[in-house]
């Protein structure tokens, strides 16, 4: 939930009547100033960055920004309470708080129903069977950061997504969209689907 997402929605998506899902972290929404937002990004979202290396544009949307997105027809998805690596959380109550209680708070504050969840960091090593079981009971759709299509599985508990960076070449984007890297992620998806069995 960076403020830049809100600006993209307002200046690009809304005029074209394109709707999007914005995944938000509860603790990040509640930060009141840009310096603290940069510190939060460095410690929770990009832990490999130092505070001074976090771009000045990496500060949070607030409740007003989120309400504006909802009023303009966009969807809010849950992205945990603190952006913790869920596989590191062994306590069930803490995991439940990260995934479910934080979502309940966002729903109440925005007067919406949240059906979508994206787990932090998006890779298999950042998720766990316990987290998946909690999320599966609470959400209709669970999004990963794993590349690939969602047509070749019967379960689809965890959805693949292709992220596109503005710096990617047309060749690289085309390669991803044609599925040339799907095999690399297939085992992770298979393993996560087996967590439900």
Residue ranges and their predicted role:
Residues 3, 14-125, 156-159:
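Metal-dependent polysaccharide deacetylase catalytic core of the NodB/CE4 family, i.e.
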Residues 3-4, 15, 88-197:
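C-terminal active-site subregion of NodB/CE4 polysaccharide deacetylases
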Residues 11:
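Active-site-adjacent structural elements in enzyme catalytic domains
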């Amino acid at each position: 939930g960076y403020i830049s997402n809100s600006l993209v929605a307002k200046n690009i998506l809304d005029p074209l009547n394109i709707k999007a899902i914005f995944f938000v972290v509860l603790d990040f929404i509640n930060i009141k100033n840009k310096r603290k937002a940069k510190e939060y990004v460095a410690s929770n979202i990009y832990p490999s960055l130092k505070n001074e290396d976090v771009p000045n544009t990496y500060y949070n949307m607030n409740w007003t920004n989120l309400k504006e997105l909802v009023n303009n027809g966009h969807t809010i998805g849950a992205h945990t309470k603190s952006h913790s690596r869920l596989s590191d959380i062994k306590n069930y109550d803490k995991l439940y708080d990260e995934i479910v209680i934080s979502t309940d708070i966002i729903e109440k504050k925005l007067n919406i129903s949240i059906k979508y969840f994206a787990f932090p960091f998006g890779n298999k090593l950042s998720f766990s069977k316990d987290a998946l079981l909690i999320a599966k009971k609470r959400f209709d759709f669970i999004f990963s950061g794993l590349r690939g299509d969602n047509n070749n599985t019967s379960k689809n508990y965890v959805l693949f997504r292709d992220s596109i960076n503005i710096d990617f070449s047309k060749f690289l984007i085309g390669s991803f969209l044609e599925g040339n890297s799907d095999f690399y992620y297939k085992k992770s998806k298979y393993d996560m689907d087996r967590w439900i069995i």
